[in-house]
């Protein structure tokens, strides 16, 4: 959620920045609602002042034995007016808040202007694409050759965009998550969490996934009569429960930054993505991801974004996978993000780069929603934390990259050296 101060004092600047994210701010509506809010606030305070003054007069008159009937009638009238004014003010504040929840975060000043992904800026490349002296197979064919990736079984069990992975590829899949968690906890300073895969609506509002992305989520309601009012949602990312661990808390500055990581399944309905990335494992309804989150002081958040992106890059480097780092333009930057880097790994079968990590600085956008603050040591004032989140990495897409980049001519797969200790020394799959 944006700082209300910005809308009250710099609304033209805010409107311009939001327009760069393809969001049209209703400036007149915001100004009109703010003017009415001020009027109702002043009216409420005025009525409270009059009531207080009248109450003093009543007390004095009562002490002197005077008739207070008319005075009491006047106070009752004031109470009715005050009740009505409070109700109008409360309803207006709810309307303002509902609209505020629809506003995306403001892009940082150094984010390049652009309308969509074609305007993103490539920052760097690491490594070189491998060269092969045989026809390249994609991960779907490689999975078919090994017999370890079964899309037909996924459709049978659940439907399209589901898969069954077994045997050696399943071991490799598990090894990837263990490798990533060990790297982030042992070398990068993150604390590992086990989290609920179902969350409540409050948690999703806290991260900005609601109300905007309602149709992209899987919602669950119990048929048990005792729990029928409880509506849960399958997490789209571990970012949701991790960020909400900060909710309604005040942290000591001395313990910052907080660095958290978790490996969870993620569930996305992918509404509106029909026809996009439908090949194989690239865009599934259910996938696994190692997530990183940092909660940090505002003045350190951009440095933390660079650090977290390097943590994600380290995974790709240790796996010796060619990738590029991309700075997203304003129009492609996510709803809650002020600045985002994508890491895209090379897929030789399609001659394309595929996103395996997205690292974002959400500034105080999420912490304002969840009321996550810290106490400044110098002035003892409460301030909103900044949060950084990033994939470290998406397991399924990283698996795709390994299968395709480490394939041999006969369809077998070489195990990356950094994963062999997690595979009991196995060097070749198939």
UniProtKB/Swiss-Prot annotation:
The keyword Translocase is annotated on this UniProt entry: no
GO biological process: selenocysteine biosynthetic process; seryl-tRNA aminoacylation
Swiss-Prot/TrEMBL domain comment: Consists of two distinct domains, a catalytic core and a N-terminal extension that is involved in tRNA binding.
Keywords for the protein's UniProt record, in alphabetical order: Aminoacyl-tRNA synthetase, ATP-binding, Cytoplasm, Ligase, Nucleotide-binding, Protein biosynthesis
Reaction(s) catalysed by this chain's protein: tRNA(Ser) + L-serine + ATP = L-seryl-tRNA(Ser) + AMP + diphosphate + H(+); tRNA(Sec) + L-serine + ATP = L-seryl-tRNA(Sec) + AMP + diphosphate + H(+)
Sequence positions that bind ATP: 268-270, 355-358
Stated name of the protein: Serine--tRNA ligase
Cross-referenced Pfam families: Seryl_tRNA_N, tRNA-synt_2b
Compartment(s): Cytoplasm
Coiled coil (residue ranges): none
Main location class: cytoplasm
Binding-site residues, L-serine: 237-239, 291, 391
Cellular component, GO, one term: cytoplasm
Annotated source species: Baumannia cicadellinicola subsp. Homalodisca coagulata
């Amino acid at each position: 959620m944006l700082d209300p101060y910005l809308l009250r004092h710099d609304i033209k600047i805010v409107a311009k920045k939001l327009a760069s994210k393809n969001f049209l701010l209703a400036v007149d509506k915001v100004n009109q609602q703010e003017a009415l809010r001020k009027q109702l606030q002043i009216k409420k305070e005025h009525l409270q002042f009059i009531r207080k003054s009248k109450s003093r007069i009543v007390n004095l008159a009562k002490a002197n034995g005077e008739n207070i009937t008319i005075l009491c009638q006047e106070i009752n009238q004031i109470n009715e007016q005050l009740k009505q004014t409070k109700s109008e003010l409360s309803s207006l504040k709810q309307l303002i808040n509902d609209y505020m929840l629809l506003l995306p975060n403001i892009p940082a000043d150094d984010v390049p202007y652009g309308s969509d992904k074609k305007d993103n800026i490539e920052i760097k490349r690491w490594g070189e694409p491998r060269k092969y002296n045989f026809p390249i197979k994609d991960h779907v064919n490689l999975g078919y050759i090994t017999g370890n990736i079964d899309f037909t079984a996924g459709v049978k069990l659940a439907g399209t965009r589901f898969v069954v992975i077994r045997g050696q590829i399943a071991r490799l899949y598990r090894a990837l998550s263990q490798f990533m968690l060990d790297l982030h906890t042992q070398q990068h300073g993150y604390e590992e969490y086990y989290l609920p895969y179902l969350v409540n609506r409050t948690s999703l509002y806290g991260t900005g996934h609601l109300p905007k992305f309602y149709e992209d989520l899987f919602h669950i309601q119990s048929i048990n009569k005792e729990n029928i009012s409880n509506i849960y949602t399958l997490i789209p990312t571990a970012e949701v429960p991790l960020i909400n661990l900060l909710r309604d808390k005040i942290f000591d500055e001395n313990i910052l930054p907080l660095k958290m990581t978790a490996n969870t399944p993620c569930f996305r309905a992918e509404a509106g993505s029909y026809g996009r990335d439908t090949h194989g494992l690239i865009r599934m309804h259910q996938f696994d991801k190692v997530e990183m989150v940092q909660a940090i002081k505002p003045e350190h958040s951009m440095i933390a974004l660079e650090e977290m992106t390097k943590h994600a890059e380290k995974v790709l480097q240790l796996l010796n996978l060619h990738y590029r780092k991309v700075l997203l333009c304003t129009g492609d930057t996510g709803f809650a993000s002020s600045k985002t880097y994508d890491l895209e790994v090379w897929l030789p079968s399609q001659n394309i780069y595929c996103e395996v990590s997205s690292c974002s600085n959400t500034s105080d956008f999420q912490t304002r929603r969840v009321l996550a603050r810290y106490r400044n040591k110098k002035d003892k004032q409460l301030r909103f934390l900044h949060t950084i989140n990033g994939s470290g990495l998406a397991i399924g897409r990283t698996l795709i990259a390994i299968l395709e980049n480490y394939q041999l001519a006969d369809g077998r797969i070489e195990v990356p050296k950094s994963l062999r200790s997690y595979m009991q020394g196995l060097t070749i799959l198939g």
